Regions:
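Short, polar/charged loop or turn motifs at beta-strand boundaries
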Residues: 35-39, 135-158, 166-170, 178-188, ...
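Short, acidic, small-residue-rich periplasmic hinge/interaction motif at the N-terminus
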Residues: 35-52, 81-90, 99-146
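Short, acidic Ser/Thr/Gly-rich low-complexity loop/linker segments typical of extracellular
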Residues: 55-65
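Short acidic/polar hinge/loop motifs at secondary-structure boundaries
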Residues: 66-67, 73, 154, 200-227
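N-terminal, post-signal-peptide soluble/periplasmic segments
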Residues: 127-128, 133-148, 152, 159, ...
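Conserved small-residue
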Residues: 257-344, 770, 789-916
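Cleavable N-terminal targeting peptides that direct proteins into the secretory/outer-membrane pathway or into
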Residues: 1-31, 76, 90-92
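Extracellular/periplasmic, surface-exposed regions of secreted and cell-surface proteins
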Residues: 408-414, 422-427, 465-523, 534-833
């Protein structure tokens, strides 16, 4: 055999061997493919096809097709469960044999109108179907919100029973406030009544205004301690968990999406304002009478609009004093009794403007998002970029702008190990001024807020009336005083899951939430004023703050089936660690050396600096057991131990827990009501906590002139967190696989209320935080889901939610007291009193019956006597020989009865005016 012949034989043998090895390898792979269709025969895109035991998950294509390729090394002819799940459909599963070669398995999914098979992860130690929950958890998916709002909370409004969502401000970028099942704290100063927020496993410290709602996949809401116990000492207000989008349900390839929204935002309806006044005018109502000493009324008149121009145009850095108009009561002046008969809002302004409408505009709103979702090999991903701009409804204010980037990655490392990354960066600019809108509502009807003088300057004083400190022009303030706040935030989570055995999972995750903001404001030198005759020297303020929070948790889950697979059990052990640090600093001063210089060094006098640091540490340990017998009886229990640096030194560790049970009556063999497709009774009782404010446990002092220390708050080493104990009972009913009804009653007792108490004078401190009360909330919630149209091409259903919560102060260990509720002029409106409804407004009422007067005055009350009933049904003082109709005829208005001669001897009585009890 020649060398060339030998070489050809060797080459042929090697190639044959290679092809045979390759063919053998291919033959060992297992390929599972199929279609997932709806009950209407339509392909379902994004349905999740899973083999749990092998940690394999893949999504369907737009044609509803899925393909799973299992490497030959994992193909052993074993049995496995193939599951398919899609939002809004009843999941299905098939037992398959994982063998070499190809097999086709198709699924037809039925519509799940009430989503009883939907999986939730909040409040439970592992993913659990809604129909097997022993307490209520509300879930809103991206399918429920096809048009995303400007912030995540607005998307929940009206969709969750028991959630009270209020937009207290229409300011661009402002997030609504939310309370779940009523307030949890009588005094929440330095804290919050809002629920704990978790974003992709990260305990949020920076709110939700920075989160792009279009990135959200679903939101789960746990409304009370009966469900939130597993989160311990910071979950008494409930929990909101947000899960952002990922590529877990994607098939091989990349899908791009772009969404652009344009619109305007305005203020509905008209703000009511008086178009007439009480000031004295000439006969043809074109000019206003000026009060001049020694000159009769209307001896001199002026054009009020020309007067407003004069005082603004001829003034330098300030407005000139205007003429004094007859009967100009202004805000604080009391007109004399001589002209009382003219004091009716009956004189018209010659020209009427709408101050609020002048200041408002239909501000533009833009929301644009570009994202990509896909799978490449073992890597799933979701990336997005978003810009949101909202000008707002107030002119001259730039509003709010947010830029957001997100990258979510899921990586399958081996058959039993995977990890995921969730990350988001946000940069926002807030250019809002909070006082402009309030000030414009105080302008009278003759104000022109955008009028300019001969020098092109906006009027600093819009009207010539005596408006006091509120007489400055809000438009001038908005044009020349521009506060600015820049916010940067990064939220990230790294999670890794390992399944060494089919019945054992281990998971570790660490989350980070970092936020920084820089705020600046400046009133420049020469800023015009209305009440000062000297040049405004200016003021400057700069501040910055940075906070970060780190939370980590290690979890072990063990599962086992007993009694020939009739009883499924799950044991979860978890430990967690949290750290939160924040630092702030600022500075500023007055008397700016140079106008236009935006630097704190420009301040010459009253220079100041501020700063603060907070550090919080917390530990947690959890054990949770869940038992499920034949899908009929579900029993669960958990115990959690928490330690937090916010607790008093002698109360560092606290214990929380939960016991729950559900009975799926419709799964009983004897239950033969064909129309009832699902019936579940449930009960759960649990405890959770609300932590004290940062400074509550410490002694605090204020630093005065020369560094002198003054005692402020007395420390308390025995301070405990508030403890929320809630019992929740409910029934879930589905009829004809269509109509869903959920009824829930929750009784929540929040003990150890954190309240400021006045300590003994000998202590030398003005206040001390103590556990000194109890608040009780009772809540009813009803949700009814009614499918109206169900066809192949259109599904339309309506959900009706109703809830009612009553909050009572059931125990108070301090003297009853008033509080203002952070509302101007409400210092004695709200009262904390045992046995009273929390939030009740207190005041005084008018006397309607003679018998309500002191006994010495009852004989003086009646027709023809000193006290008579007026046409409105109130008892008023008339005096002897007068009637309630003699006010103008006898010139009795504004005559007064001294307090010493009046009932109760406290209040002066005005003639004809109702009497306060």
């Amino acid at each position: 055999m020649t060398i060339s012949t030998r070489f050809r034989w060797m080459t042929t043998a090697v190639l044959a061997l290679l092809f045979s090895v390759s063919a053998s390898a291919l033959a060992q792979n297992a390929t599972i493919t199929g279609k997932v269709l709806s009950d209407g025969g339509q392909p379902l895109y994004g349905a999740n096809v899973v083999i749990d035991a092998m940690q394999i998950s893949i999504g369907t294509t737009a044609a509803g097709v899925y393909t799973i390729v299992i490497p030959g090394a994992r193909v052993k002819g074993q049995q496995a469960v193939l599951r398919v799940r899609a939002i809004g459909y009843v999941p299905q599963m098939r037992t398959i044999t994982v063998s070499a070669g190809a097999q086709t398995i198709n699924f037809d999914l039925k519509t799940d109108v009430n989503r009883l098979n939907q999986v939730v992860v909040t409040g439970v130690a592992g993913a659990t179907e809604v129909k097997k929950l022993a307490f209520s958890v509300a879930q809103i998916s991206s399918a429920d919100q096809p048009v995303a709002g400007s912030n995540p909370l607005s998307q929940l409004q009206g969709k969750v029973a028991g959630a009270n969502i209020v937009s207290a401000s229409g300011r661009p970028g402002a997030a609504p406030s939310i309370i779940l099942r009523g307030p949890q704290s009588i005094n929440a100063s330095g804290r919050s009544q809002e629920p704990m927020v978790i974003i992709d496993g990260v305990v949020s410290q920076g709110g939700l205004a920075d989160i792009n709602p279009q990135d959200i996949d679903n939101v789960e809401v746990v409304k009370g301690a009966a469900a939130s116990s597993m989160y311990g000492s910071r979950a008494g207000n409930g929990v909101i968990q947000i899960t952002t989008k990922s590529g877990k349900s994607s098939s091989e390839g990349i899908k791009f999406r772009a969404n652009m929204e344009f619109g305007t935002s305005g203020v509905e309806n008209e703000y009511p304002f008086p178009k007439s006044h009480i000031m004295l005018m000439n006969e043809d109502f074109t000019r206003f009478c000026v009060a001049v000493s020694g000159v009769p009324d209307c001896g001199r008149t002026v054009d009020i609009y020309a007067e407003a121009y004069r005082i603004n145009d001829q003034g330098g850095d300030f407005a000139l004093p205007p003429a004094t108009f007859v009967n100009d009561g202004g805000i604080a002046r009391n007109p004399g009794q001589v002209n009382l008969r003219a004091l009716y809002l009956s004189n018209p302004f010659p020209k009427v403007y709408n101050p609020v409408r002048q200041f408002l505009t239909n501000g533009q709103v833009y929301n644009g998002t570009v994202d990509a979702t896909g799978r490449v090999g073992r890597t799933n991903f979701f990336v997005s970029a978003n810009q949101f701009r909202q000008e707002g409804s107030v002119k001259l204010i730039d509003g709010y702008m947010r830029n957001a980037l997100r990258m979510n990655i899921d990586q399958q490392m081996t058959g039993n190990w995977n990890f995921s990354v969730r990350s988001a960066y946000t940069d926002a600019i807030d250019n809002n001024s909070g006082s402009a809108f309030f000030r414009v509502t105080r302008q009278p009807a003759n104000a022109t807020v955008f009028a300019r003088d001969s020098k092109g300057r906006l009027f600093i004083r819009t009207v010539a009336q005596q408006q006091g400190a509120q007489n400055d022009n809000p438009a001038y303030n908005s044009e020349n005083f521009r506060p600015r706040n820049r916010i940067s935030r990064f939220v990230g989570n790294l999670s890794s899951k390992w399944q060494p055995l089919g019945w054992l999972d281990a998971e570790f995750n660490v989350g980070y939430d970092g936020r920084s903001n820089f705020a600046e404001s400046q009133q420049d030198r020469g800023y015009r004023t209305t009440t000062s005759s000297t040049t405004n020297l200016g003021i400057i303020d700069r501040s910055s703050a940075r906070s970060y929070a780190l939370n980590s948790a290690a979890t072990v889950v063990m599962r086992r089936s007993w009694l020939q697979n009739a009883l499924d059990s799950r044991l979860t052990l978890r430990s967690s660690y949290e750290t939160s640090d924040s630092r702030s600093q600022g500075g500023g001063g007055t008397n700016l050396a140079v106008a236009g210089l935006r630097d704190p060094d420009a301040a010459i006098t009253n220079f100041y600096t501020t700063g603060g640091t907070e550090q919080i540490r917390a530990l947690g340990m959890l054990a949770d057991v869940n038992l499920d017998y034949k899908g009929r009886y579900i029993v669960g229990g958990l115990v959690r131990r928490d330690a937090a640096s916010l607790f008093g030194a002698s109360q560092r560790w606290q214990t929380y827990g939960r016991a729950s049970m559900a009975w799926r009556v419709s799964e009983e063999p004897w239950f033969k009501v064909s129309k009832v497709s699902d019936l579940k009774l449930r009960i759960s009782e649990g405890t959770a906590g609300n932590r004290p404010r940062y400074s509550a446990q410490y002694e605090t002092f204020t630093i005065g002139a020369g560094g002198a220390l003054s005692p402020s708050s007395l420390g308390n080493k025995d301070l405990r967190p508030e403890v929320s104990r809630e019992m929740e009972v409910g029934v879930d009913l589905e009829v004809m696989n269509k109509y869903g009804l959920t009824v829930t009653f929750a009784n929540n007792v929040i003990n150890d209320q954190l309240l400021p108490v006045t300590p003994p004078a000998a202590a030398g401190f003005g206040t001390q935080w103590q556990n000194a009360g109890e608040l009780t909330n009772k809540t009813w919630e009803v949700s009814l889901n009614v499918p109206i149209i169900q066809t192949r091409d259109l599904n339309y259903s309506a959900r009706i939610n109703w809830d009612r919560t009553t909050s009572m102060i059931t125990r108070l260990d301090i003297p009853e007291t008033f509080y203002d509720g952070n509302q101007q002029g409400a210092e004695t409106m709200y009262k904390i009193k045992q046995g009273e409804a929390f939030g009740s407004m207190w005041g005084r009422r008018f006397v309607k019956k003679c018998s309500e007067l002191p006994s010495a005055f009852q004989s003086k009350c009646g027709s023809g006597l000193e006290y008579q009933k007026n046409a409105d049904g109130f008892i008023v003082y008339t005096g002897t020989g007068n009637t309630v109709n003699d006010g103008i005829t006898k010139n009795l208005w504004f005559t007064r009865l001294p307090a010493a001669s009046a009932p109760w001897g406290v209040d002066v009585l005005g003639w004809g005016l109702p009497i306060l009890v």
